[in-house]
Amino acid sequence: MKESPFIAVLKRELDRMVSRRIYFASCIVLPLFSIFFMATIFGNGQMENLPVGVVDGDNTATSREIIRMTEAVPTFRITRHYADEAEARADVQRKSIYGYLSIPSGFEAKVMDGKETALTYYYHYALMSVGSEIHGAFQSLLKSISVVPIVTHAVALGINQEEIESFLLPVTTQNHPLFNPDMDYSVYLTQPFFFVFLQVILLLVTTYSIGSEGKFHTSANWLAVADGNIWVAVTAKLLPYSFIFIVMSILANYVFFGVMHIPMDCGFWALNLTSALLVIATQALAVFLFSLFPAFSIIISIVSMVGSLGATLGGVTFPVLHMFAPVYYASYLFPVRHFVEIGQNLLYGNYGYAYMWGNVACLLLFLIPPLLLLPHLKRSLISRKYDDIE
């Protein structure tokens, strides 16, 4: 009995995969490394022991007490003591430290006399995440320090602790960070960052698997095995990669949410189905791009750029809604953008299908453009006019 073209192409692709080490590296090693990398990069999930410096121009018991209070803040680690601000500022510019606290000369004397004085802090804000942490920690520290003289005088006058607190803090606040109460970076970034990496790998692997047929002059054999049916040729060729990357996605979700215990408000089925949909949509995008630019050397550069743009426009580190309007609308041309929106819905509330059906539909729509361009892809493979473009 004659073997079906689909099975024949599938077996042919499996033979190609096991005969070339690049497929093992890109389909197995890179995703596994990405899982390990994203599971460990954030450590305990918070920024701690950031190097800062101190400029102590007062050299008194009060200034030394302030330095001890600064050292007690988990965010900081005082690595340098400076004689003047110029040297400290130079180290901030060199990123040897991320900020410094300046205690002016005569600070203790002014505090004891009840005169106004100031503690100044400087921090490197070009690195926004680090700068925000340094700024917040300094703000909290100096708020505590600023009330110490008042408390000392009030206690000396015989005022009890409750009256002092009601005077200094007439209004108290309660802070309740939703979905991430520990302010853990890994809770928000680990899973989407992995899939940002994965979509870049997917784009490159998919275009390489198709483009290498032309590069190594095997496209005629590929089509012949598929009995001239380009739909069978493409789907059977990509099926092993779909299976491998979906398995890697499921493994990643298990590691992140099962082993690392990152909190989520949905079940594994919803996460895994969304991940599988991202894999298929990204492969469809890669086929579409290759059909438009069927030259191997050109398409690798194009999909690398598209993968990088997808990482930027995924909305993981900066809200896309606040980007330039044309960029915001362009972000929906990338599957990873829809995946991130679905993931945020599932992980941080599981608000229901009504809030994410649009993104699911968009991921499914990515399957249509490559189908329309399959005839063009077949003609380019038969003509072989793009095979030798460098």
Sequence positions of predicted segments:
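Selective transmembrane-helix segments that form parts of the transport pathway or gating/packing helices
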Residues: 228-255, 360, 364, 368
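Alpha-helical membrane-protein architecture signal
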Residues: 3, 7-11, 183, 187, ...
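Hydrophobic alpha-helical transmembrane segments
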Residues: 129-146, 179-194, 212-224, 245-253, ...
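Membrane-spanning alpha-helical segments of multipass transporters and channels
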Residues: 59, 251-255, 263-390
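Long, hydrophobic alpha-helical segments
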Residues: 190-209
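Transmembrane alpha-helix boundary and packing residues in multipass membrane permease domains
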Residues: 40, 205-208, 253-257, 287
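Extracytoplasmic/periplasmic domains immediately adjacent to an N-terminal transmembrane anchor
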Residues: 1-186, 380, 387-390
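Juxtamembrane interface at the cytosolic side of transmembrane helices
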Residues: 203-238, 383
